Amino acid sequence: MACEGRTMISDTYKVRVNLGLCALAAAITLAGCAGLPDQRLANEALKRGDTALAERNYKALADLGYSEAQVGLADIKVATRDPSQIKEAEATYRAAAATSPRAQARLGRLLVAKPDSTQAEREEAETLLKQAAKQGQSNTLIPLAMLYLSYPQSFPKVNAQQQIDQWRAAGNPEAGLAQVLLYRTQGTYDQHLGEVEKICKAALNTTDICYVELATVYQKRGQADQQAALLGQLKSAYARGAVPATRVDSVARVLADRSLGQTDEKTAKELLEQVAPANPASWVSLAQLVYDFPELGDTDQLMAYIDKGREAEQPRAELLLGRLYYEGKTLPADAQKAEQHLQAAAEAGEISAHYYLGQLYRRGYLGNVEPQKAVDHLLAAARGGQNSADYALAQLFSEGHGIRPQPGNAWVFAQLSQANPTPQSAELLQQLDQQLTPDQRNQAQQLLDQEKRARGSLAQGANSTLALEALQDDEKEVDGEDSL
């Protein structure tokens, strides 16, 4: 339709916005003349991974004061996982929250995920999520459950299980998934596979994260027939646009996870190859798959996938490339190149990159042992959920390379590493137990309690797909164009 044909616009809008008729019509109808900001175009671009186009359109509308476009712009900043961008996103959400329930929900979720949050921020997150839920916003109860499970000391009057029971009794559709999250967090997931299956079968058509949970259940049980049927449903749902490419990627990673049982790496590769053109992050998942299962491709294929991931500015591609240079198996060892790529990944929010950087500095791969850098990066990794970083910290303080041995600190991190124990970490803890005097033990116990409080209580559940996606945008939410 030509711009001149848009004459049915109220005088009120003409007065409020001093723009030409064509620009104003584009901003309101969102069908848009060429080159003008368009929220529907931005929404569709974001879903297919074209963040540059989405950002341009969101920004143009956000500058006109549209709160839903401001939310979309902030969503893009959060997705970068860059701490500085996330800080900007928090400010943007906060500005829009006065008029937008979606912004309230986003800000609440962001505060739940915020490292080193204050008591005031946790209470604000609770208030925002409750307000957003009352106004019909989805994806609010699971973040609330995460908040209560992460910081029980901040909400002493709340019993997470009782709260979830109340939500389930009230028929809230998110309550079942909150229960699944609680099982993951408490380390009792394997004891409740039957209930997880029941919850997610009932919610599968409305909550596509359940594809990941059901795939996990069937993988753990070794139920190949049920897994095949589920994958058939997944492929059909993806083909008709009912499930996003990111969900297919998550299921593929379950199939390739050795810790869950017998893998099906070939099917995982087929799924990833199908969605990678629409979901650039899947190029990195393919690279990781070939790295884990070398029979699926040679080094050239691995590097081709990494290159595509880097072209799409995927931090996980930098992480994997840094690991290759760090390990020196697939590629020649090169500590300087490893540091370069790992730093890029760490700056973009990849927790594992801090672990490998810490090991670079702890082991002196760059020429000298740099203990303070090692501690900084390993602690960041450990507090971000990388359990192997705790063992590395225990080794660092125990061995004393470049620093004076500190058995008390070593004992603290050896204890923390027992969340996922190995024979090596258990042996080190036993040795340290014998070294400490009663006074040293008391001091170390105080440090351990302090570190546990700093980390919260979500160690086992925080990095699950369910937990991570609960803190991100809900792709099934109604797009914002109707409210503009």
UniProtKB/Swiss-Prot annotation:
Residues with a covalently attached lipid (N-palmitoyl cysteine): 33
Tagged with keyword Lipoprotein: yes
InterPro entries, A to Z: Alginate_biosynth_AlgK, Sel1-like, Sel1_AlgK, TPR-like_helical_dom_sf
Lipid attachment points (S-diacylglycerol cysteine): 33
The keyword Ribonucleoprotein appears for this protein: no
SUPFAM superfamilies per record: HCP-like
Biased composition (Acidic residues): 471-484
Annotated Gene Ontology cellular component terms: cell outer membrane
Family to which this protein belongs: Belongs to the AlgK family.
Function statement: May be involved in the polymerization of mannuronate to alginate.
Official protein name in the record: Alginate biosynthesis protein AlgK
Organism of this sequence: Pseudomonas putida (strain ATCC 47054 / DSM 6125 / CFBP 8728 / NCIMB 11950 / KT2440)
Lineage of the species this protein comes from: Bacteria, Pseudomonadati, Pseudomonadota, Gammaproteobacteria, Pseudomonadales
Gene for this chain: algK
